[in-house]
Amino acid sequence: MLQKGCEKMDSYFKDTLPHNRAFREMLRPAKEQVKHLSPDNIAQRSGAVFHESDGVLELQSLNQTVRITVPEYTFSPRLEEWHQLVILHYLALADGTAISDQVITFGGLKDGLIRGTKFDHDMEKELQRFLNGKTPDCIRKICKALGAEFADSNADLCAVFHFLPNYPVWLKIWFADEEFEASGKLYLSRSADHYLTMEDAVTVGEILLSKLKAQESDKAETSLDNRK
């Protein structure tokens, strides 16, 4: 169900992603880049685990165990294609820098002044639509389904998603009250630039939003099935 939901990415964010042809053109060099690296070294720098006997790199992504065969770099289970590409870029770029507890907006990334700041603004609008009409309990359940942990913060709810081993994403939510609608913001670790580019970071945010929406759809379908 999650994969089905991911393939139906929100129309706004669909328009921001390249077409399938561009994906295929990007996939080839991404695989070539990691093929020239030692799997042991990749694991050490990225937080993945290399099972040498099986020729498999294993990591966690949003509460899902992902196994990547080496040297083919094929994925099991099969992920949405942009999710695969981001992981390949992560494995190639990771330098082992410790995760910083300091959070930043996408606009605070190395090359984020224009692209990241725009993404922050657009994502706030998308999150406001996503949160509209949902109870705090419903939001917590959706976040938990993606493996989120909850942390203390200046927000009403702060969910920390482990998108990749050294690449957490914070979702801060302020619940609706008599004066304001519910709102949310995404944040990354100050160390994020050591693992992914600005464009990849944007793709991470888009994938996370699509996964949240997919969980919402799954819960709605389950509720309807239970009523039959």
List PLM regions with ranges.
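Acidic/proline-rich low-complexity IDRs
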Residues: 1-2, 223
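Amphipathic, interaction-prone secondary-structure segments
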Residues: 41-70, 149-175
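Alpha-helical oligomerization segments
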Residues: 177-228
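Conserved binding-pocket/active-site segment within a compact domain
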Residues: 132-194
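Domain-length accessory/inserted modules outside core catalytic folds
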Residues: 57-58, 113, 117-128, 152-155, ...
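Generic detection of long, well-ordered alpha-helical segments
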Residues: 77, 132-136, 198, 202
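Short Lys/Arg-enriched alpha/beta "domain-start" segment
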Residues: 2-54, 83, 90-147
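Intrinsically disordered, low-complexity regulatory segments enriched in Ser/Thr/Pro
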Residues: 63-89, 174-199
